[in-house]
Amino acid sequence: MKKFVKGVRFAPKNYSDEVEAKIQHYKREGYKLPSRHLLRTEEQLAGIRESARINTALLDYISENIREGMSTAEIDHMVYCFTTDHDAIPAPFLYEGFPKSVCVSINDVVCHGIPSTKEFLRSGDIVNVDVSTIYKGYFSDASRMYMIGEVSPEMQRL
C-alpha cells in the first residue's frame, strides 16, 4: 500500500531502481536520452546558479513593477531590458520563431501567451509570467503568478 501524507506519496526505498528500470525501458524503445552526467564541474554548477539568480531577480523586479493598465508588451520590454542589463539573454526570444522575450498568460490562457501591445492587465486578472534566462550558456527557467488589483476568491484559489 502506498503511503500518503497530505496528498504526497513517499518515494519507495527502491526509487533509484524504478527510475533506472524506466530509463532502460525508454532506451529499448529507441528514445534518445541525455547523459545522466550532464554536470561535471563546480564551474558548471556555478553557471547554472548565476543564471537562476538572475532569473529569480527578474521575477522579483516584475513583482515590484507589474500593475493594472500595463500591456503585456510592457512586461516583455521589462524582461528584455533587465535580462540584457545583466549580461544574459532571454531564452524564448526568437527560439523556434517565438517573437518575444517572455511568456505572459492571463487568466484562462494555460501557458505560453505571447505579449501584445493590445492586451492590458485589468483588476481581477491573474497573470503568469514565465521567464527563461541564458547566462554564459547556462539556462534557468521559472514562472510566477501575480494578482492584479482585487482578485475574486475563486481566482485566488487557482
Predicted features, each with a name:
Residues 1-158:
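Active-site neighborhoods and metal-handling regions in enzymes and metal-associated proteins
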